[in-house]
């Protein structure tokens, strides 16, 4: 399920960048 990993890795809010 790369979609799930992509959603997490592509989440700026999750990374705390925004």
Curated annotation (Swiss-Prot):
Q: In which tissues is it expressed?
A: Eyestalk sinus gland.
Q: Name one GO biological process term.
A: chemical synaptic transmission
Q: Is Transferase one of the keywords?
A: no
Q: Which GO terms describe its cellular component?
A: extracellular region; synapse
Keyword Protease belongs to the record? no
Q: List every position bearing Valine amide.
A: 18
Keyword annotations of the record = Amidation, Hormone, Neuropeptide, Neurotransmitter, Secreted
**Which GO MF terms are attached to this record?**
hormone activity
Which cell locations does it reside in? Secreted
Domain of life of the native organism: Eukaryota
Q: Which family does it belong to?
A: Belongs to the arthropod PDH family.
Record function comment: Causes the migration of the distal retinal pigment into the proximal end of the pigment chromatophore cells and thus decreases the amount of light entering the retinulas. May also function as a neurotransmitter and/or neuromodulator.
Q: What is this protein called?
A: Pigment-dispersing hormone C
Give the originating organism: Faxonius limosus (Spinycheek crayfish)
């Amino acid at each position: 399920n790369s979609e799930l990993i992509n959603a997490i890795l592509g989440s700026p809010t999750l990374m705390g960048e925004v």
